A protein has these predicted regions:
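Blade-loop segments of beta-propeller domains
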Residues: 76-113, 121-131
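Beta-strand-rich domains and repeat architectures in extracellular enzymes and scaffolds
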Residues: 35-67, 83-95, 245-247
Length: 268
C-alpha cells in the first residue's frame, strides 16, 4: 500500500484508535530487545516476508516493478527473484505452502501460485476485495485485506472458508497489514503505526500489543511518510522473530519484553 491512497478521514480514524488511549489492563503491551541486526535492501518496499530453511523470502512493491525474492539473511543478497507481470500489478503478501509460493496483489483481485524452488508461475486465482498479506498455520492460509477482517483460505482451492473480525478493547482494528503465524497466534502490522498486534485466531480479540517505537534509528530513516514498519518473519525451529520495514536498511531479530499494562499508545 502507498500513502496517497489513504483518505484523510481514514488516516485520522486510524491514528485515533492508537493515540492517547490506554490499553485495557487485560491487554499486555510489549517492548523489545534487539538480538541481532541484519542488512536489508533499502530499495525494497516490503509487502510480504517469511523465513524458510535458512532464507528470507520477500515480496516488494510498488508499481511498476513488484518482485518476489529469495534472500540471504546474513547479507541481504538477492539469490533469486522474479518480477510480477504485467507491471500494472502491485505485488502484496506472500506465503509458502508445501512446494508452492502464493502471492496476492493489491487492488486487482488476482493472486498467483509459483513453484517455490524456481519461481515459475503455475496458476492464478481470484478473490474479492483487496489483498494485503498472507501467512499460514500448517492447514490454512490466513489473509488480510486492509480491513478488520482476517480471512482463512483453503490452501488447495484458495477459497475462503471463514473469517474473523479483529478487535482491541471491543473496537475493530483497521489497516491490518503484514501477517505472521507465531506460536498459535497471528501477528499483524498495523499500517502507518509502530505497532504489531497479537491476534487470537479463533475470536479475533487482540491478545497483546507490541510497541516497536524507536526500532529503526533516526539516522537510518528516509523521511518518506510511507517508509513504515512492515514485515514479520518467524523461524519456528529456533524461535527467532524478525521485523523490518518498507525501504528500511536494516532487518532486526527481536525479543519481546513485557511492559506495564497501563502503557498508552502514542501514535505511529
Amino acid at each position: 500500500m502507498i500513502l496517497r491512497t489513504l483518505p484523510a478521514a481514514a488516516l485520522a480514524a486510524l491514528i485515533a484508535l492508537f493515540a492517547a488511549a490506554p490499553v485495557s489492563a487485560a491487554v499486555p503491551v510489549y517492548g523489545y530487545q534487539i538480538v541481532h541486526t541484519y542488512p536489508h535492501d533499502r530499495k525494497a518496499f516490503t509487502e510480504g516476508l517469511f523465513y524458510l530453511n535458512g532464507y528470507l523470502y520477500e515480496s516488494t512493491g510498488p508499481y511498476p516493478r513488484s518482485q518476489i525474492r529469495k534472500e540471504d539473511l546474513a547479507t541481504a543478497k538477492v539469490l533469486q527473484s522474479r518480477d510480477l507481470a504485467p507491471s500494472s500489478l502491485f505485488g502484496e503478501g506472500i506465503v509458502n505452502w508445501k512446494t508452492h509460493l502464493v502471492q496476492l496483489t493489491w487492488q486487482t483481485q488476482i493472486g498467483f501460485v509459483y513453484d517455490l524452488a524456481t519461481f515459475k508461475p503455475l496458476k492464478r486465482f481470484t478473490y474479492p476485495g483487496e489483498g494485503w498479506a498472507l501467512t499460514q498455520n500448517d492447514h490454512e492460509l490466513v489473509m488480510s485485506d486492509g480491513t478488520p477482517a482476517i480471512r482463512f483460505l483453503n490452501p488447495d482451492s484458495l477459497k475462503e472458508t471463514h473469517r474473523i473480525t479483529v478487535t482491541l478493547d471491543g473496537r475493530p482494528v483497521e489497516r491490518l497489514n503484514e501477517l505472521e503465524w507465531v506460536r498459535g497466534e497471528i501477528l499483524a502490522n498495523v499500517w502507518m503505526t509502530n505497532y504489531i498486534v497479537r491476534i487470537n485466531p479463533t475470536t479475533g480479540v487482540v491478545a497483546g500489543v507490541i510497541d516497536l517505537t524507536g526500532l529503526l534509528p533516526a539516522s537510518d530513516q528516509s523521511g518518506v511518510t510511507d517508509d513504515v514498519l512492515n514485515g514479520i518473519a518467524y523461524d519456528a525451529k529456533t524461535d527467532r522473530l524478525f521485523v523490518t520495514g518498507k525501504r528500511w536498511p536494516k532487518l532486526f531479530e527481536i525479543r519481546l519484553v513485557k511492559k506495564s499494562q497501563t502503557a498508552s499508545f502514542t501514535g505511529g
